[in-house]
């Protein structure tokens, strides 16, 4: 009597799952205008979460802590005390 021992193997390898492979979109935070740059009223100066930079003279703070210019002028990033920074906009005189 003839006995055959047949073994069948998968023709596709089993594929495992992974819990990696996704990331959130960057929020494009940070300085939008440079120190000493001329800015117009309404220009966004700094996008941030929390108050890393505080609003100074002629600078407003939006609901998401974004800093924006209230008047036309020159932007200056300054120290505020020992451990804080602020952004101010100083109007330039007409010549």
UniProtKB/Swiss-Prot annotation:
It comes from the Bacteria. One of its GO terms (biological process) is translation. One of its GO terms (cellular component) is cytosolic large ribosomal subunit. Residues 1-9 form a propeptide. The N-terminus is cleaved by ribosomal processing cysteine protease Prp. Keywords: Ribonucleoprotein, Ribosomal protein. GO terms for molecular function: structural constituent of ribosome. Disulfide bonds: none annotated. NCBIfam families: L27. Belongs to the bacterial ribosomal protein bL27 family. This is Large ribosomal subunit protein bL27.
């Amino acid at each position: 009597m003839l006995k055959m021992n047949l073994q069948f193997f998968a023709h596709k390898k089993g594929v495992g799952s992974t819990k990696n492979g996704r990331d959130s979109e960057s929020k494009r935070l940070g300085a939008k205008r440079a120190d000493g740059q001329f800015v117009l009223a309404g220009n966004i100066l700094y996008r941030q979460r929390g108050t890393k930079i505080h609003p100074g003279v002629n600078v407003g703070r939006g609901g998401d802590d974004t800093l924006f210019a209230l008047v036309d002028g020159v932007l200056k990033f300054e120290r505020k005390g020992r451990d804080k920074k602020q952004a101010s906009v100083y109007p330039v005189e007409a010549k």
